[in-house]
């Protein structure tokens, strides 16, 4: 034997892909080799002129060791910077059983409610926390970050308000990053932002106003009077409130506000260099149909049992397109679940103890400084003590002394320093900080602490009284509660999830491990640059890899979702055109097949959408494109194009599409939703795209988290790079530094980037090329097998599809009355999550198997759909009544088949329709959910007590 052959750097690719299936899959397609297959599937006109320029693969162990070396270059100081980001403790029972558990992190957004009741309940808990702490009756299931939530509040205030004004007031005490994002949004909405003293907010005419509660420098102001004065004018008032402070302070609703928003990071979500974190968004009941983002609501199932679902979806971009309330798809479900479970585990007394401890430590520190003669700026505060030293020299000295002791403070200005206390602060920290501020070694602090919050500011009402927050305070009980919820959800640790345009591939364990390393999770986004060398090396590595893959000249990591990536890409185009005297260009061409985020994003940037027809094959109609590009050539801004198309086909005319738009003065934005069919085969920049967004949570293995987090970085050509998002606080050392931001943190959800780094490093050049080929191979195998029973709606060259295929159910529906929804629900009885339903074509299923599914799993899925076809035929032939058959009654629960049975089909046909199902059985916890009832009777708070008695 040869020693060199016993070391296999490509071992991970063999775990990610099923190499042993290659011959059988190719044979089924009538192909002799993988190269022949790719040649017969991908148009030669789009192929890359050179090989993929990535390093060779490393083993799992070597990749982890290399990443550990990079991570170790980050310095973990004790962070007292604040500004919306604070050290926190993730209870280990939540860390291990939610954040590190594939049963939670590999699930998709809960579109199929019957197999998502666990995380729906967890998100309902999160909403209840937000409802209790803000005092409003309705809260959403998270937004991307606090700054985005503030921008959404501004837009919502304009939608629902009655004041005839285009001006919005912003409290000068809001976080700088929040104001930065609001400036970006306000410009293209045509709003004027007026920043000023909170107490003078009522001196102008504003459609809306935003106040910070607690202020960025730590002060807590009584906002009740100024809010009252604004309300008499009809102004819609939003309050950005620190979630931990609301445990003690009066709620925003009690202050008289209309909307409350903020970050829930303090409830057990690590700082992670800025994200991901779940923002909260709560509001008055009358605004619920104008609110952004997901809302979980209580409905009932077919048996009348309470059941949860995503409510009021008609507000959203996939339905309302350019008229949507927001371009947001999904936000931060996994992080919202962490925050909600933090409240479940600690309960009302636990969170009060934590909030009081934070406040007591800050108050004790302030008292000691005052007794030592120092000037504490604010007399009323929650957690942040700001001291004015009167000179820059003294400020520098204190800042340096703290740094030398391992503490990061915030320099407010030349004479002021702030220290923000938090959940992990200790009495030992008090001594160290006192020494840094005074130069004295120690002080004696009393056990009895007089807080710095005035009595009239304190909350009088009870919080977290629901049984869910008062039942699981021992670890055993919490563990079992989490397991009970997990068992109600079908995630990728049970079976493949073939959602088209979603790329539900393997999220390997080795990829996930580093996100909980303290070197990544415990870094404040505004930590001194000398302490973040590891992150900067990680970002540089990632930028080089993504540039090599896509062909672009620059990468921006700031967008913290795919929708934000779209917005950032189109924003860069708008800024570029304005800088070149072409700000009048306001027409955006969008193909008829596009995802709803595309027109919603265009509308948010003040663009008018012109729809381009598609032909009978699903491709962009080149003649119609040419006619419209020429018609609008003087005002054409851009085209938004997805590639391969949303119909799952490589359009041979993509170079012509780009050329036509460029010839008529426009730019090409490429939607990267389908990038999984491009890597190593083509480069979007090379075929003519000017900017592309990439979904790291699709193509590059960041898990979907049951509805977030995601990352949507953009690749840009050199001419657009100076117009990518910048940041007001963080020096990004790039050409776009002076631009305003799209997200709160400069690098978005930076702490989940190690997942993608690990994927790229373990796959290497060869593995990444193979992954794309396997994605195509699996999709075409599924399409070929299913074409024996169902029409495949669109195909390209040689009858091939790209990485996904669309199964047309309309002929079956016309003959049998069985709908695409019936088939989607019936798949649950076979143990599978449905593919994408009725997108991009109504009455269809769009299937994307990804590269990481084995032939055995594909065959089970195919067998399920083939058997369902036979079931539909039984209905068609009259063997089963149209109103009583396994399809219209799906899904079937354990309660169904153990109770009375009067159906014309057997219990076995209901729940074990094929032999493999017995070994792979997943039991939905509710019957089909009544969508209409849930919207007509909206309840988005926790269920009554009796529902928790099991």
Identify the meaning behind each predicted range.
Residues 269-282, 286-287, 331-335, 425, ...:
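Conserved phosphate/anionic-ligand binding catalytic regions in large, soluble enzymes, centered on
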């Amino acid at each position: 034997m040869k020693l060199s052959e016993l070391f296999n750097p490509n071992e991970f690719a063999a775990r990610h892909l099923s190499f042993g299936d290659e011959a059988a899959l190719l044979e089924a397609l009538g192909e002799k080799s993988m190269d022949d297959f790719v040649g017969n599937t991908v148009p030669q006109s789009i192929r890359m002129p050179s090989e993929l320029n990535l390093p060779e693969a490393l083993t799992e162990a070597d990749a982890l060791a290399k990443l550990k070396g990079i991570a170790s270059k980050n310095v973990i100081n004790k962070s007292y910077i604040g500004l919306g980001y604070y050290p926190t403790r993730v209870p280990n029972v939540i860390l291990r059983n939610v954040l590190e558990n594939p049963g939670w992190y590999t699930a998709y957004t809960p579109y199929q409610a019957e197999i998502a009741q666990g995380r729906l309940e967890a998100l309902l808990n999160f909403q209840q926390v937000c409802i209790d702490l803000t005092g409003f009756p309705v809260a959403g299931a998270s937004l991307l970050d606090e700054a985005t939530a503030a921008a959404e509040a501004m837009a919502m205030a304009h939608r629902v308000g009655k004041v005839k004004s285009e001006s919005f007031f912003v409290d000068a005490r809001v976080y700088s990053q929040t104001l930065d994002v609001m400036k970006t949004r306000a410009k293209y909405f045509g709003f004027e932002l007026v920043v000023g003293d909170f107490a003078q907010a009522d001196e102008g005419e504003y459609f809306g106003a935003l106040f910070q509660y607690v202020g960025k420098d730590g002060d807590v102001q009584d906002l009740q009077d100024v809010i009252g004065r604004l309300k008499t004018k009809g102004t819609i008032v939003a309050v950005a409130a620190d979630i931990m402070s609301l445990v003690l302070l009066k709620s925003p609703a009690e202050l008289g506000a209309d909307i409350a928003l903020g970050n829930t990071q303090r409830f057990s979500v690590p700082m992670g260099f800025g994200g991901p974190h779940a923002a909260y968004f709560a509001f008055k009941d009358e605004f619920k149909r104008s609110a952004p983002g997901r809302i979980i609501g209580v409905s009932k199932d077919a048996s009348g049992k309470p059941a949860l679902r995503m409510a009021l979806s008609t507000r959203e971009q996939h339905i309302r397109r350019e008229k949507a309330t927001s371009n947001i798809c999904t936000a931060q479900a996994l992080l919202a679940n962490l925050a909600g479970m933090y409240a479940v585990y600690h309960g009302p007394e636990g969170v009060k103890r934590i909030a009081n401890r934070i406040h007591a430590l800050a108050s004790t520190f302030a008292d000691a400084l005052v007794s030592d003669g120092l000037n504490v700026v604010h007399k009323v505060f929650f957690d942040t003590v700001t001291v004015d030293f009167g000179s820059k020299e003294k400020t520098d000295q204190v800042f340096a002394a703290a740094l030398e002791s391992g503490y990061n403070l915030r320099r407010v200005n030349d004479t002021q320093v702030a220290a923000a206390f938090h959940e992990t602060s200790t009495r030992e920290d008090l001594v160290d900080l006192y020494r840094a501020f005074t130069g004295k070694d120690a002080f004696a602090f009393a056990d009895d602490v007089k807080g710095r919050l005035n009595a009239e500011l304190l909350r009088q009402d009870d919080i977290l009284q629901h049984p869910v927050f008062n039942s699981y305070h021992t670890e055993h009980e919490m563990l079992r509660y989490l397991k009970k919820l997990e068992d109600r959800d079908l995630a990728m640790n049970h079976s493949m999830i073939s959602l088209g345009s979603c790329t539900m591939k393997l999220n390997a364990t080795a990829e996930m491990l580093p996100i909980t390393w303290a070197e990544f999770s415990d870094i404040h986004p505004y930590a001194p640059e000398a302490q973040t060398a590891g992150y900067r090396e990680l970002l540089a590595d990632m930028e080089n890899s993504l540039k090599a893959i896509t062909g672009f000249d620059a990468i921006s990591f700031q967008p913290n979702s795919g929708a934000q990536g779209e917005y950032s890409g189109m924003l860069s185009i708008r800024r570029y055109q304005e800088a070149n005297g072409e700000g009048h260009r306001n027409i955006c061409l969008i193909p008829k097949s596009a995802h709803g985020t595309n027109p919603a994003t265009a509308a948010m940037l003040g663009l008018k959408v012109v729809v381009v027809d598609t032909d009978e094959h699903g491709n962009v109609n080149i003649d119609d494109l040419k006619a419209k590009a020429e018609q609008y050539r003087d005002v054409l801004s851009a085209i938004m194009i997805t590639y391969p198309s949303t119909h799952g086909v490589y359009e041979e005319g993509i170079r012509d599409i780009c050329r036509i738009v460029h010839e008529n003065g426009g730019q090409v934005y490429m939607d990267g939703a389908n990038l999984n069919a491009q890597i190593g085969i083509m480069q979007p920049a090379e075929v003519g795209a000017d900017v592309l967004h990439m979904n790291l949570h699709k193509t590059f293995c960041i898990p979907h988290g049951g509805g977030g987090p995601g990352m949507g970085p953009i690749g840009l050509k050199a001419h657009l790079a100076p117009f990518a998002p910048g940041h007001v606080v963080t020096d990004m050392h790039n050409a776009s530094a002076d631009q305003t931001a799209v997200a709160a943190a400069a690098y978005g959800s930076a702490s989940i980037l190690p997942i993608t780094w690990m994927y790229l490093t373990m796959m290497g050049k060869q593995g990444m090329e193979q992954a794309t080929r396997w994605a195509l191979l699996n999709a075409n195998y599924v399409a070929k097998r299913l074409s024996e029973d169902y029409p495949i709606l669109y195909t390209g060259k040689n009858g091939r599809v790209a990485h996904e295929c669309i199964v047309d159910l309309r002929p079956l529906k016309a003959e049998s009355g069985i709908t695409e929804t019936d088939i989607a629900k019936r798949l649950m009885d076979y143990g599978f999550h449905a593919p994408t339903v009725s997108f991009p074509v109504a009455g269809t299923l769009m299937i994307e198997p990804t590269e990481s599914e084995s032939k055995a799993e594909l065959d089970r899925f195919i067998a399920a759909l083939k058997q369902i076809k036979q079931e539909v035929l039984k209905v068609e032939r009259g063997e089963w009544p149209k109103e009583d058959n396994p399809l219209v009654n799906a899904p079937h629960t354990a309660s169904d088949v153990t109770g009375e049975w009067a159906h014309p089909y057997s219990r076995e046909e209901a729940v074990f329709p094929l032999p493999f199902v017995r070994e792979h059985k997943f039991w939905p916890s509710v019957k089909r959910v009544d969508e209409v009832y849930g919207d007509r009777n909206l309840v988005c708070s926790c269920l009554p007590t009796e529902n928790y008695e099991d």
